[in-house]
Amino acid sequence: MSKTRNGLIEHCKSKLGTPYVFGAKGEILTQAVLDRLARENPGTYTSAYKAKAAKYIGRRCLDCSGLISDYTGRIRGSYNYHDTAVERVSINHLDESMIGWALWKPGHIGVYIGDGYCIEAKGINYGTIRSKVSATPWQKVLKLCDIDYTADQAPVTYHEGFQPAADGQRWWYQYSDGSYA
């Protein structure tokens, strides 16, 4: 079964309110998992950070890339998502055709859900939230390699009848199946 843009968006919406713990990819946080994450990320896991994270023991937790990895089943970090993206576009070119694409800046990733909003696992003090795209200094929009962006596109509708040619001087007849004469 393919992973689609709509599926990714629905997954992200279902994770709103999920606690953020750096390195977590959707698993239930246990003391053993917390200890492993602290060993793997000693620069992040200060004693204060560990104390905050310990409050989430027994709950499913995510970090920013874990929000996406939990849906795709492929563990990647934010830089890996950037490097494996099918397309990378400047954030200045974000438009509504990019719903379900990832928003990226060095060290952080979120998912564009449309109308100027994204869902991101923002940090241990915020958790997984819906936020305005303009509230974070995103740099790029990424078309993710693990998502099928064609599966849930609306079908193309052709209108049967005469259509003007590009030169504006001739006409052609288009059938409802898209063929023409």
Give the location of each predicted region.
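N-terminal capping segments
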Residues: 1-65, 69-74, 106-108, 119-125, ...
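Intrinsically disordered, low-complexity, compositionally biased regions/tails
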Residues: 27-30, 70, 114, 127, ...
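Extracellular adhesion/carbohydrate-binding repeat motifs centered on closely spaced tryptophans
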Residues: 151-181
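Short, repeating "repeat-unit edge" segments in beta-repeat architectures
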Residues: 105-109, 166-168
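Aromatic side chains
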Residues: 20-22, 112, 173
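Loop/turn positions that initiate beta-strands
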Residues: 97-101
